[in-house]
């Protein structure tokens, strides 16, 4: 079960797989999609510019993607951040690859806003607090309209010639 604007959407099985197969409408729209990935704003957490890059195939661990798929996924992350910066949506971001057992893994692109620092001093350490705060305080028609506008901006830019060719980058850390 997921929620959006206080509405419940029932999902049977893996929400990530249902999302990838278009078994339900993505409330905030899809900003970018290709054969392997979908990019959209997180409709459950109404933070402006909070995007999810989700593989269409079900994976639980990063290493289940090929090197080319990982490169492509992080190219999408890179392009999304550039578009958000160029359109003055946000200037700082945290990137999290959420890898959980029995879940459809995906990348979170989390914008950094001043209000987050007011809630807690270490954003990554307290990400749950930030997400819960957004769920409790930002589920308004106005915020969802802004989220839809940002999705349209990102979608338009992904379609432009400037972003047609994926920029090859290497954002992997050695652990």
Q: Each predicted region: which residue ranges?
A:
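HIT superfamily nucleotide-processing domains
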Residues: 1-175
């Amino acid at each position: 079960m997921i929620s959006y604007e206080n509405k419940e959407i029932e999902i049977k099985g893996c929400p990530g797989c249902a999302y990838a197969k278009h078994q339900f409408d993505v409330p905030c729209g899809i900003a970018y999609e290709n054969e392997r990935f979908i990019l959209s704003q997180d409709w459950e957490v109404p933070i402006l510019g909070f995007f999810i890059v989700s593989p269409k195939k079900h994976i639980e661990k990063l290493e289940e993607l090929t090197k080319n798929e990982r490169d492509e996924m992080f190219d999408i992350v890179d392009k999304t951040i550039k578009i958000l910066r160029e359109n003055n949506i946000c200037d700082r971001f945290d990137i999290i690859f959420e890898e959980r057992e029995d879940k459809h893994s995906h990348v979170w692109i989390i914008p950094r806003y001043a209000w987050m620092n007011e809630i807690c001093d270490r954003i990554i350490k307290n990400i749950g607090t930030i997400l819960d705060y957004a769920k409790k305080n930002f589920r308004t028609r106005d915020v969802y309209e802004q989220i839809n506008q940002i999705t349209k901006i990102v979608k338009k830019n992904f379609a432009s010639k400037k972003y047609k060719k994926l920029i090859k980058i290497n954002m992997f850390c050695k652990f």
